[in-house]
């Protein structure tokens, strides 16, 4: 019988799995590696894992037998049906109190279901977001675990040891119950979509209106990366824009302008609609990728549909132009994160989760794709007030957006004048203006709904009267002259 020496079992030896195993071994943990294809295990042990505290398993039974109790088994395999299949194979060999960790990109409703099913069987289940890509897995990812709280004391040391560190603090903390870990990872990915789209719009404005070369744009991003916009995505954009092909021309300009997506941004946008949250920037970022995908249609439209042209002298003050653009990017980024945390807040309320908001912001400060110095202020905001309703109610962020507002508006106006699409910048500003409006035209919208569908409406308290009572659903015959008013409970 195999000796139980493993601290962690890991199933799935694609690059992410291998790198996470090597990371754990570097931190003094003994890892048992398993893959359905035995040759992958053998190759890994003979090469990258050679000489490290990594042992192989030849079967599910062998994997389980080599792990210390309570057994901790992490899955880094394709999301969906393969996870369910593997869990079914694992469970008969486990004891109550053993721990299964799904580290893949699972959709949170699936994690909720697995959590419920395994809890009934006495198995502790953790759904953990893992961000940072291949390098993150190897040298320190952002980890977002949630699920069975009883599992946390058993996996905390491993997770916080292998996680990225920000100012000495691990970018890993317990998120909350059920599928909350994967939910937070989903929102992280949605914010990532938004950040990337904002950066692309800034690039497009500099290129098409400012007529900057790629090298000049790279220099702008390099400068921005020393200030409030310092982040991983700004850093890699700088590097991409100065990368030349073998002919000396920028490689980025040779890439087809059709962006792919794996679906996590779409999940975030759909969930925002389900919960009634105006997470507009992530939604526009998803739609921007969809628009990019219809390349042939866009080519035909470019020959048929007229629009303004950009004159050579569109920009008279390049320094002011770049400053305004920086302010637009910064303010829009604040809106994106404010919307993301609004969604997390509403999810906690709707799903009955108690979430650790300060820890969520901290987890994103290092190791992950959206890591940035900006997140330090979000962490501080939620540490100062864990129940903060919206980031825009925090003094730092309210002041930052107010200061950036003029440049933000000028940038969007300039882009609109010359026909440059800015869906993310524009929706961020539209949200800001809507959010700060005490009164919106939804009064007319609700009257329209009542006119054609008897959907009823409510009266403003200061406008209440005997025939228009407050706190009542009211329907009116709009084809008359103010008569035929009746209360109704009809809703649609």
Swiss-Prot record:
Q: Which InterPro entries match?
A: 6-PGluconate_DH-like_C_sf, 6PGD_dom2, 6PGDH_C, 6PGDH_Gnd/GntZ, 6PGDH_NADP-bd, 6PGdom_BS, NAD(P)-bd_dom_sf, Pgluconate_DH
- List the record's Gene Ontology CC terms alphabetically: cytosol; plasma membrane
Top EC category: oxidoreductase
Gene assigned in the entry: GND2
TM region positions: none
> Which GO terms fall under biological process for this protein?
D-gluconate metabolic process; pentose-phosphate shunt, oxidative branch
Give the residues annotated as active site.
Answer: 185 (proton acceptor), 192 (proton donor)
Q: How does it assemble?
A: Homodimer.
What does the entry list as the binding residues for NADP(+)? Answer: 12-17, 35-37, 77-79, 105
Q: What is its EC number?
A: 1.1.1.44
Also noted in the record is: Present with 556 molecules/cell in log phase SD medium.
Write the record's keywords in alphabetical order, separated by commas: Gluconate utilization, NADP, Oxidoreductase, Pentose shunt
Its family? Belongs to the 6-phosphogluconate dehydrogenase family.
Which reaction(s) does its UniProt entry say it catalyses? 6-phospho-D-gluconate + NADP(+) = D-ribulose 5-phosphate + CO2 + NADPH
List of residues binding substrate: 105, 131-133, 188-189, 193, 262, 289, 449, 455
Protein name listed in UniProt: 6-phosphogluconate dehydrogenase, decarboxylating 2
Q: State the superkingdom.
A: Eukaryota
What is the purpose of this protein? Catalyzes the oxidative decarboxylation of 6-phosphogluconate to ribulose 5-phosphate and CO(2), with concomitant reduction of NADP to NADPH.
The signal peptide annotation in the UniProt record is none
Pathway in which this enzyme or protein is active: Carbohydrate degradation; pentose phosphate pathway; D-ribulose 5-phosphate from D-glucose 6-phosphate (oxidative stage): step 3/3
Q: Name one GO molecular function term.
A: phosphogluconate dehydrogenase (decarboxylating) activity
A Pfam family per the record: NAD_binding_2
């Amino acid at each position: 019988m195999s000796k139980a020496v493993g601290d962690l079992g890991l199933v799935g030896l694609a690059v992410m799995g291998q790198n996470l195993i090597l990371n754990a071994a570097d931190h003094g943990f003994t890892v048992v590696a398993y893959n359905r294809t035995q040759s992958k295990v053998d190759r890994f042990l003979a090469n990258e894992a050679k000489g490290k505290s990594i042992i192989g398993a030849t079967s599910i039974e062998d994997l389980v037998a080599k792990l210390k109790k309570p057994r901790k088994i992490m899955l880094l395999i394709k999301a969906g049906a393969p996870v369910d299949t593997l869990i079914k194979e694992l469970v008969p060999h486990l004891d109550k109190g053993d721990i299964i960790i799904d580290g893949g990109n699972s959709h949170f409703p699936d994690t909720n279901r697995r959590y419920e099913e395994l809890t009934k069987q006495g198995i502790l289940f953790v759904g953990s977001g893992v961000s940072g890509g291949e390098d993150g897995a190897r040298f320190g990812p952002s980890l977002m675990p949630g699920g069975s709280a009883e599992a946390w004391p058993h996996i905390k040391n491993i997770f916080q040891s292998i996680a990225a560190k920000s100012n000495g603090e691990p970018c890993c903390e317990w998120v909350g119950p059920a599928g909350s870990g994967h939910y937070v990872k989903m929102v992280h990915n949605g914010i990532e979509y938004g950040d990337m789209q904002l950066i692309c719009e800034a690039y497009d404005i500099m290129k098409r209106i400012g007529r900057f070369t790629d090298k000049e744009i790279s220099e702008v991003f390099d400068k921005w990366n020393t200030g409030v916009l310092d982040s991983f995505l700004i850093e890699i954009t700088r590097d991409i824009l100065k990368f030349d092909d073998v002919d000396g021309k920028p490689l980025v300009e040779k890439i087809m302008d059709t962006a792919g997506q794996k679906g996590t941004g779409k999940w975030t946008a759909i969930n925002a609609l389900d919960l009634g949250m105006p997470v507009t920037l992530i939604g526009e970022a998803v739609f921007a990728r969809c628009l990019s995908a219809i390349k042939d249609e866009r080519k035909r439209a470019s020959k048929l549909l007229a629009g303004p042209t950009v004159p050579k002298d569109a920009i008279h003050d390049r320094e002011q132009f770049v400053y305004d653009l920086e302010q637009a990017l910064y303010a829009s980024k604040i809106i994106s994160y404010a919307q993301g945390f609004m969604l997390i807040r509403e999810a906690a309320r709707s799903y009955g989760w108690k979430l650790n908001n300060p820890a969520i912001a901290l987890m994103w400060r290092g190791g992950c794709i959206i890591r940035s110095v900006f997140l330090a202020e979000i962490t501080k905001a939620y540490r100062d007030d864990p129940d903060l309703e919206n980031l825009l109610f925090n003094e730092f962020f309210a002041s930052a957006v107010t200061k950036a507002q003029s440049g933000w508006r000028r940038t969007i106006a300039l882009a609109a004048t010359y026909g440059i699409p800015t869906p993310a910048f524009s929706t961020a500003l539209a949200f800001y203006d809507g959010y700060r409006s005490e009164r919106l035209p939804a009064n007319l919208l609700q009257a329209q709904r009542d006119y054609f569908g008897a959907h009823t409406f409510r009266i403003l308290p200061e406008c209440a009267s005997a025939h228009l009572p407050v706190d009542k659903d009211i329907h009116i015959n709009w084809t008359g002259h103010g008569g035929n008013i009746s209360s109704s409970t009809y809703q649609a």
